[in-house]
């Protein structure tokens, strides 16, 4: 996930006017939590597919481009491939379960962040978590993707300048060390600018929690019901196969 992906999700979450955008942050967090808990609990591929399809359908109704979101949510599938290689037992169910869990969990969280501005999400979490934990989660969310994007740009620039060559490993190490040092300098500079921007926007050492975490039964009932239904189905299938 690049910084562009984070920025476009911020745009979707703040510009949308659908029923899912209007729902309270607490309802959508509970929905995502229910989906993720169901993903962790179940070993049923059909239920994982149902959760994935439900998220895609919600995004389509919310007028968030589902294909773009599916692309963003597919990043964990590359990491899941490593588990497939190590855990494969010769059946199709094992890779389907691993990939299904990765895609369903990622799509659940992307659905939350694509329909809820992230300051409201982390502001809600700060009500229930220690102050330092909430702040750390908020800043980590922003900084990790920025650093990954910057690192990718530096590696690309180094390759274009013939700084990485298979026949010259020592030269590669030297160039990578220089690129890493440049990345650290840029990271410190970017962190200072981000802090200044947050101060201008009203940050005073604490993320402001949203005044209303619920928007009423009409707006919040469906997200909560979907999360609860997914978790209930996972529990029933797990203990009553």
Q: For the regions a protein language model found, what residue spans apply to each?
A:
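Hydrophobic transmembrane alpha-helices of multi-pass, membrane-embedded glycosylation machinery
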Residues: 52-59, 76
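Structural signal for the C-terminal ends of transmembrane alpha-helices
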Residues: 41-42, 59-64, 115-117, 235-237
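Alpha-helical transmembrane segments and their helix-entry boundary regions
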Residues: 28, 47-48, 67-69, 134-136
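Alpha-helical transmembrane segments of multipass membrane proteins
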Residues: 33-37, 56-60, 84-88, 106-111, ...
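Transmembrane alpha-helix interface motif
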Residues: 1-45, 51-55, 153-241
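Juxtamembrane/interface alpha-helical elements of multi-pass membrane proteins
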Residues: 70-170
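Hydrophobic, aromatic-rich alpha-helical transmembrane segments
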Residues: 21-25, 45, 65-72, 91, ...
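Short helix-capping/hinge motifs at transmembrane helix termini and TM-loop junctions
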Residues: 43, 62-63, 90, 130, ...
């Amino acid at each position: 996930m690049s910084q562009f992906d984070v920025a476009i999700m911020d745009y979707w979450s703040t510009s949308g006017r659908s029923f899912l955008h209007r729902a309270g942050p607490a309802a959508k967090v509970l929905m995502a939590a229910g989906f993720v808990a169901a993903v962790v609990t179940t070993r049923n591929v059909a239920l994982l597919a149902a959760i994935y399809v439900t998220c895609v359908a919600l995004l389509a109704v919310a007028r968030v481009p589902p294909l773009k979101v599916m692309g963003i949510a597919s990043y964990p599938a590359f990491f899941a491939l490593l588990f497939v290689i190590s855990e494969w037992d010769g059946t199709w169910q094992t890779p389907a379960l691993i990939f299904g869990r990765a895609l369903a969990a990622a799509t659940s969280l992307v659905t939350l962040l694509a329909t809820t501005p992230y300051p409201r999400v982390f502001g809600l979490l700060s009500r229930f978590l220690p102050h330092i934990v909430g702040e750390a989660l908020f800043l980590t969310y922003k900084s990790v993707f920025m650093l990954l994007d910057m690192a990718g740009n530096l590696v690309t620039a180094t390759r274009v300048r013939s700084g990485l060559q298979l026949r010259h490993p020592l030269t590669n190490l030297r160039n990578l060390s220089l690129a890493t040092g440049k990345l650290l300098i840029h990271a410190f500079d970017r962190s200072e600018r981000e802090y200044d921007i947050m101060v201008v926007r009203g940050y005073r050492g604490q993320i402001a929690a949203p005044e209303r975490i619920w928007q009423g039964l009409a707006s919040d009932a469906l997200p909560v019901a979907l999360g609860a239904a997914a978790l209930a189905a996972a529990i029933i299938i797990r203990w009553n196969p």
